[in-house]
Amino acid sequence: MSAATERERLTNANPNARGKDNSGAAIRQRFLKFYETRGHAVLPSSSLVPEDPTVLLTIAGMLQFKPVFMGQRERAHERATTTQKCVRTNDIENVGVTARHHTFFEMLGNFSFGDYFKKDACQWAWELATGEFGLNPERVWVSVFREDDEAFAIWRDVVGVPESRIKRMDEKDNFWAAGPTGPCGPCSELYYDFYPERGLEGADLDDDSRFIEFYNLVFMELNRDADGGVTPLKNKNIDTGMGLERMAQILQGVPNNYETDLIMPIINKAASMAGIDYNACNDVQKQQLKVIGDHTRAVSYMISDGVFASNIGRGYIVRRLLRRVVRNGRLLGIKPEEGASAFTPAIAEVAISMSEGCDPQVAKNSARILAELEREELSFQKTLGRGEEMLAELIETAKKTKTGLSGKDAFTLYDTYGFPLDITADVATEAGITVDLEGFESAMAEQRSMSQAAHQTVDVTAGNALARVADELGAKSTFIGYESTSSDVSNVLAIVCGGESVEEAPEGAKVDIVLDVTPFYAESGGQVGDNGVLHTADGATLEVSDVQKAGGGRIIVHTATVTKGSIKKGSQVTANVDENSRRRAKSNHTATHLLQSALKKVLGEDVSQAGSLCGFDRLRFDFNSPKAPTEAQLLEVENLVNGWISQSAALTAEEMPIAAAKDKGATMMFGEKYGDVVRVVDVPGISMELCGGTHVSNTAEIGGFKILSEAGIASGIRRIEAVAGAGVVELLQQRDAVVKQLASALRVPPEEITGRVSSLQEDLRATQKLAESLRGELAVAKAGALVSQAREVGEAKVLVARLDGVDPAALKVAAENLAAQLGDGAAIVLGSANGANVGLVALFDDKVQKDGGLKAGQVLGAAAKKCGGGGGGKPGFAQAGGRDATQLDAALDEALTTVTAALSPK
């Protein structure tokens, strides 16, 4: 059956749907309007970054209502309807392969919070599908949970679906649960039948070639306890989901979700940039285009919601998806549009133009999206070529030896060339080669282990002893450091010395001490541990240099040196924190909270913490950002922080249930594990964060704040280092000393240093310019001897020659001089070796470009590639470089052959 005939068959399957607006945008609005007229509040899609810090991405429409379903939040509405943007990557290998798998999709949903239940949900679902959308009732099947007789009866007796089209299914298909315990219940699904002529007998709803599930109704009526027993819920809820892409496929009469108007415009854009027609493509090309269409939607919406490419968490999903787009685009031959350096932004512009109905913010954030796509694509392109070459060699070896690709090799591609494992697996699968996934994971684990070992600072033997101590004590240390920096009476619960638990440690011993009560802060949350002293009544003194947690955080361990006397287990000590160090750590910690708020104000609410260190001398703050802040932005951040310091704002710290902290809007760090009760540090109107660290009581105590540096530490991760409080004074003193030294060396007053340096720079530039001019003259002199080597090809004068020891700028001057001497029809390619490096230049005048169809960039690009490099330029002039001078002669020969062939008379 031809594609046109199949489309006609699909379109004619639902006569009542014809004549209606069945565009994706219209289906979305018709769904929402249908439920709005039935008392549902129309609510916007929530972010792809969910409130719950334990969930990576929004994967279902019900996620924004989960606290209501779980009884953790009061309901604002009894009924609601939404269109929710979702991202799932668990079926990423099926994207483009099957008709309906996606990473990004829209879930249309209607919800009831203790209001209507099964009967209304089933009736409205049927009315929507067969009435509003006009589906042929004879093509709609229903599934119910095998034990849900009530739902079966509603579908049969109330809605009127024949028993022959109602299927009872097992728990894995038709029973929903949020987890092992909590709200749960049976569900009922609506399926569309593409081939009813196959009959009722033996029909299998799992047959994807015949059926598509398009609407799922979850009846949350039960609560499952820890023992597995279920009891009825007091309030029964409805949670439904209809895949917009699936309904669009049915109503638009197309064979798969990708050919709907929700995705096809993106695919067509990619195809046009590849110079191909989707309808004329083979299956492999179509699959590649579908991957591009799907993944481009996903990354556009994710970046709009503040998720930027990185190597961790959500950011890695963006990176992984975008790299799949880039690779498939390369395989299709997609090139950037004229004037552009990357091709993904042009494709994303189509996705953005179609986003209004789902999320109006996407269009508003278009500049951010396009900039991030360009940055990440160009970054990946730098390593992709080398990685592809290595992978091709590995695959050829695997074919010859009839072995799969080893996990070690797959990891090398990942670690060295930035190749995600799934891309390696994709390429290998295309070549019929398997990948040792277990070996990859082993190599990954080994690297993590080595990394952890390299950063290990705690003695392993001592750590084991402390773990045993924690188990033996069965108690926890009590921290009183929020209220006080000293303790008059603390009992020594345990002493570890030399990796062993001891009863007594002599003078000079380095020990780990566990106290029952301590004012010492143990390193956590980015803040370093306190230092200070311990004293016993009989005159022993211990200098504390570090404080850590052990035993799963139950005990606080003081690393100390016995400087006087001896210390015994069971002794009572006075514990005194060094107040100057604590004051500096507190100032730096509060400053990081202010810094995060300032970054959000200046760079956008998308900024989130990726790590921090609050030491005694300075602070460090890592954050997610796709690009470096400008100097002006950093100054604005600095001024904001200092402004808040001068406001003398009082801080409050309060413990509360984590649900209450979320409701207050407290900032949480993704990936951090929080207990049921959390500590919220609040600078009213400025900052509110979950934090267990020590802080100043008033921002004025910080005194001042100064940024020292800002830099990228990983893709998508930036780092700011700064000082606060006393550190600012010390910085000013140090810089004042440097200024005085410079003034003395330059023999000018401090205020004239800038002018004197500018004058010296001008002198240097003039000298460099003179040197460059002399090198150019030397190159021209050398090139003069080459004019006689030019050969006439047709009406052109072709000169391809080697001019060693000449830098790129001088090589360009030489080419221009030769062109002037050769006159009309000049076609010049020059190469120069400087050690192992290669410089290349090509110059073609207008006549050469017209007669031979030659482009300097293309000719030079091929030559540079032979020398292990690259480059480009305009049709008339191009420059390139390489890293393998041994191939320069071969590269020039290839260029000569290309130019001669193009210009020879036909």
Curated annotation (Swiss-Prot):
What is written about domains in the entry's comments?
Consists of three domains; the N-terminal catalytic domain, the editing domain and the C-terminal C-Ala domain. The editing domain removes incorrectly charged amino acids, while the C-Ala domain, along with tRNA(Ala), serves as a bridge to cooperatively bring together the editing and aminoacylation centers thus stimulating deacylation of misacylated tRNAs.
Its name, as the record gives it, is Alanine--tRNA ligase, chloroplastic/mitochondrial
Is the Nucleotide-binding keyword given for this protein? yes
SMART domains from the xrefs?
tRNA_SAD
The entry marks the following residues as binding Zn(2+), namely H589, H593, C691, H695
Function as written in the Swiss-Prot or TrEMBL entry: Catalyzes the attachment of alanine to tRNA(Ala) in a two-step reaction: alanine is first activated by ATP to form Ala-AMP and then transferred to the acceptor end of tRNA(Ala). Also edits incorrectly charged tRNA(Ala) via its editing domain.
Q: Which PANTHER family match?
A: ALANINE--TRNA LIGASE, CYTOPLASMIC, ALANYL-TRNA SYNTHETASE
Q: Which InterPro entries match?
A: aa-tRNA-synth_II/BPL/LPL, Ala-tRNA-lgiase_IIc, Ala-tRNA-ligase_IIc_anticod-bd, Ala-tRNA-synth_IIc_core, Ala-tRNA-synth_IIc_N, Ala-tRNA_ligase, Ala_tRNA_ligase_euk/bac, Ala_tRNA_synth_plant
The subunit field of the Swiss-Prot or TrEMBL record says:
Monomer.
User: Where primarily located?
Assistant: plastid
Q: Which GO terms describe its biological process?
A: alanyl-tRNA aminoacylation
Classification via NCBIfam families: alaS
Q: Where is this region: Disordered?
A: 1-22
Per the record, where are the segments of Basic and acidic residues compositional bias?
Answer: 1-10
Q: Where in the cell is it found?
A: Plastid, Chloroplast; Mitochondrion
Pfam families registered for this protein in UniProt: DHHA1, tRNA-synt_2c, tRNA_SAD
Which reactions are catalysed by this chain?
Answer: tRNA(Ala) + L-alanine + ATP = L-alanyl-tRNA(Ala) + AMP + diphosphate
Query: What Enzyme Commission number(s) apply to this enzyme?
Result: 6.1.1.7
Sorted UniProt keywords: Aminoacyl-tRNA synthetase, ATP-binding, Chloroplast, Ligase, Metal-binding, Mitochondrion, Nucleotide-binding, Plastid, Protein biosynthesis, RNA-binding, Transit peptide, tRNA-binding, Zinc
Family membership, please give it. Answer: Belongs to the class-II aminoacyl-tRNA synthetase family.
Needed cofactors, names only, are: Zn(2+)
What does the record's cofactor remark say about binding? Binds 1 zinc ion per subunit.
Q: What GO terms fall under cellular component here?
A: chloroplast; cytosol; mitochondrion
Q: Which organism is it from?
A: Ostreococcus lucimarinus (strain CCE9901)
As one GO molecular function, the record gives:
zinc ion binding
